[in-house]
Amino acid sequence: MKHFNLKNIIAAAALAATALGANAQPKGPAWLGNALFYQIYPSSYMDTDGNGIGDLPGITQKLDYIKSLGVNALWLNPIFESGWFDRGYDVIDFYKVDPRFGTNSDLVALVNEAHKRGIKVCLDLVAGHTSDKCAWFKESMQKDTNLRYSDYYIWTDNISENDKKEIEERRKGPNPASDTRGRYVEANAPRAKYYEKNFFECQPALNYGFAHPD
């Protein structure tokens, strides 16, 4: 029997995300062409520990039912450790299952049980940004720019007057943390005054366009 560890699963998630992209070429795993997906938002699926939040063991318990629907692939919304400001899309650690859903071992068990039933499992990989609580971001904000994660984010001391205006407008709003307007966040970190975000202020954009790719 073939077993899978968490790194294998994350690699598969990245592959699926690439293959399903809007501009993807007809490449990738052969099974994807005939896949019939069943999407699960884990928080609202089956809860096995009575805390009111769905979890991975709950999904595993329902695999026979899912199989009976005629699907052959699962798509799980984000399950990685998260600050949970944006329903799991503010990832703290891409290598750890959020405790609300279970453990890394629970994820491996789910994948193995799904594969026994001919069901593939794809994870929603949040590839554009992380949480500002992510260890990568905390290292990147340091003054030393030669650290491993220094260039994982986009920092600057100079932004346009319009960008400054958008920051001020967010600050004056009723809930600045939930305001998605604008491009930059005022950080006043050792590294620089501002960082680029994707959506909310707590979601610093990952840097795909500069030096030192990992």
Protein language model features and the residues they cover:
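Bacterial N-terminal signal peptides that target proteins for export
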Residues: 1-10
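Hydrophobic h-region of N-terminal signal peptides that target proteins for export
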Residues: 13-22
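Acidic/aromatic-lined carbohydrate-recognition and catalytic surfaces
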Residues: 25-212
